[in-house]
Amino acid sequence: MAAALSRKRRLEELTVDEFLASGFDSESESEPEGAPEAETQAVRAAAREPDGPGGSPLASRRKGGASEHKDQLSRLKDKDPEFYKFLQENDQSLLNFSDSDSSEDEEEQLHSLPNMLEEASEEEEEEDGVPRGPEGKRRDSVPVTLAMVEKWKQAAKQHLTPKLFHEVVQAFRAAVATTQGDEEGAETSKFQVTDSAVFNALVTFCIRDLFGCLQKLLFGKAPKDSSRVLQPSSSPLWAKLRLDVKAYLSSVIQLVACVAEATVAAAILQHVGSSVPYYLTFPKQCRMLLKRMVVLWSTGEETLRVLAFVVLIKVCRHKKDVFLSPVLKQMYITYVRNCKFTSPSTLPLINFMQRTLTELLALDTGVAYQHAFLYIRQLAIHLRNAMTTRRKETYQSVYNWQFVHCLYLWCRALSTICPSEALQPLIYPLSQVVIGCIKLVPTARFYPLRMHCVRALTLLSESTGTFIPVLPFILEIFQQVDFNRRPGRISSRPINFAVILKLSKVNLQEKAYRDGLVEQLYDLTLEYLHSQAHSIAFPELVLPAVLQLKSFLRECKVANYCRQVRQLLEKVQENAEHIRSVRQKVSFGVSDQRAVDAWEKRTREEGTPLTKYYSQWRKLRDREIQLEISGKERLEDLNFPEVKRRKVGDRKDEDRAEFKDLFDLESDDEDDAPDFTKRGMPGSPGAWQKVEEEDDDSSSSSGEEEVSKSEDGSPDTEAGLDPQELWQLAQGPEDELQDLQLSEED
């Protein structure tokens, strides 16, 4: 009793924190004094019984714990009302306690196993990424063999099943993981590919045969209309195959990024092109595919560029509203990035990007207008800044390859898509930007850039039927350049105006500059006048050009330049006379626009002298341009002498032949000089040639000159000496000819 009072007294002296840390009841309250030990043992024995009269011992223990906790809180309310009030204000969850809450909490803490364990499905295992065995442990990877691949191939051709397709996809993913160095992915896969022969066989099987079997499994027979695209999601088996197809498509994209061999990459891209309907089902994989195709379209080998573009246009044609606009934006940015530098080797690739990008823009003129308006406006802003500030940095932002190629791209796009009501309003602002680019720095050093702009305007004017005053920018060069001035230096290499924008001061003094300039002026004038050759106003249009060309012929004294310009003038005057004679027979006036258009259309179909000449000239010129791009045509025409250095063995053979002929000539004197055939003459032509070649191997012409002099009977030839003098010469120093070997026949 005294011990109980002391414990109770200590309880009253406890603080709130100490009270919460200790139990709520004293030992006397939880267990009455004098409780027999046998009763305690009986309680423990009852707890061990699996079933009691009132239910399971676990449930009774939960219920007893909840009621006991309630009693403790009620006693706390009587003993310490202040602390109980504190709990009411700060911890209501402790006071609002029920038997059900206690049972639920304890059930969460004590987990009970179900009667039947649920097995994971193949799809859940696929998303988990880690194949596991029946006990939840990671199972060992199965090595793929050639026999397994052949077995899969034969089974797929006979009848492809979802389970077989799942296994093949797992093996294909393991093979692709090895190409990326993904060791963890290869280890966690169900299969493992370690042999290169197995890798090649597996990839070949998947690319060539697997999707054909899958198509047969999903749709049965092929559709009668081959142009109609079947949606894989319309098949009843799609739900079972969806995740495996998704994993396979992702692996194919990874494989395209890893393959370096062009032929293998081309085969994979052909497979990707045939599987575009499957990519369209998965937007994420489709975006990944488009991003990779844009990279190949701009940087890949020529065949890969074409195949990548085929994939791009297939996707954009079927999903215009989703993918066309972002793909156009990405392709334009990539195009600008890749045309920063231009050379004869990169120019065909830039032209390919221009044409293919134009083809994508033609899919939807509404989307094309949005992009064209935005980027033409951007070019105009750069030009305006350069015209207002007049600093070197600002005009360099315009006079560069990226700006010029962008101008040419939009001129080509508007020309190709024409006629289009949506893009028609952009012709005028684009032509003004090009003309402003020409007028920004109109000096001789930027004539190549002017010619690029003139070509773009000519293309735009001819294709859209819009009159653009291009001829003044060509004729202005005839007035500014003095073609009679003697060149300051002569260059053996011609200037390729197709791959330059600016000429150096040294180039302006070269003869090759004026030769190329006259040739370019001839081409540009003929191209522009050909586009206007059917016009009813052609005689009046070419009048300034005729006057300028006649003035050039009067002033120029260079025959080659005059011959080209005179030929151009004759063709222009012939075409003007033809148009003048034909239009005299018409009865309508120039104010009748419909009649004028009909007459011009009929004239174009019938042809004019200038158009007939242009068609023949164009064929020859295209061939010449291709040769100039390769950089070989002009150097072949110059016929430079080649310095060929003979080998030591060749020299000895030729020396033997020369000495043999020489000794045949002196055969009459053999009796007087018996030892002559065994020693060479120091003054012989072969000996002089040998010495000169040893002194200077790079000068082959000098040796040939000595030989020619000897053959003509020059003073160096010793053939006219008498035998005694020849004998004295033969006794000369032997070290000069010790390397020569005479033929044993002599």
Curated annotation (Swiss-Prot):
Source superkingdom: Eukaryota
Subunit structure: Interacts with p53/TP53. Interacts (via the N- and C-terminus domains) with AURKB (via the middle kinase domain). Interacts with TP63 (via activation domain). Interacts with histone H3 (via N-terminus and non-acetylated form preferentially). Associates with core histones and nucleosomes.
Organism of origin: Bos taurus
Protein's cellular compartments: Nucleus, Nucleoplasm; Nucleus, Nucleolus
Region described as Disordered: 19-82, 117-141, 662-746
Biased composition (Acidic residues): 26-36, 119-128, 664-674, 733-746
GO annotation, biological process: apoptotic process; negative regulation of transcription by RNA polymerase II; ribosomal large subunit biogenesis
InterPro entries, A to Z: ARM-type_fold, Noc2
SUPFAM superfamilies assigned: ARM repeat (SSF48371)
A GO CC term assigned to this protein in UniProt: nucleoplasm
Principal location: nucleus
Free-text function comment from the UniProt entry: Acts as an inhibitor of histone acetyltransferase activity; prevents acetylation of all core histones by the EP300/p300 histone acetyltransferase at p53/TP53-regulated target promoters in a histone deacetylases (HDAC)-independent manner. Acts as a transcription corepressor of p53/TP53- and TP63-mediated transactivation of the p21/CDKN1A promoter. Involved in the regulation of p53/TP53-dependent apoptosis.
Family: Belongs to the NOC2 family.
Protein name: Nucleolar complex protein 2 homolog
Keywords (A to Z) from UniProt: Apoptosis, Nucleus, Phosphoprotein, Repressor, Transcription, Transcription regulation
Sequence positions bearing Phosphoserine: S56, S93, S667, S743
Biased composition (Basic and acidic residues): 65-82
An example Gene Ontology molecular-function term: histone binding
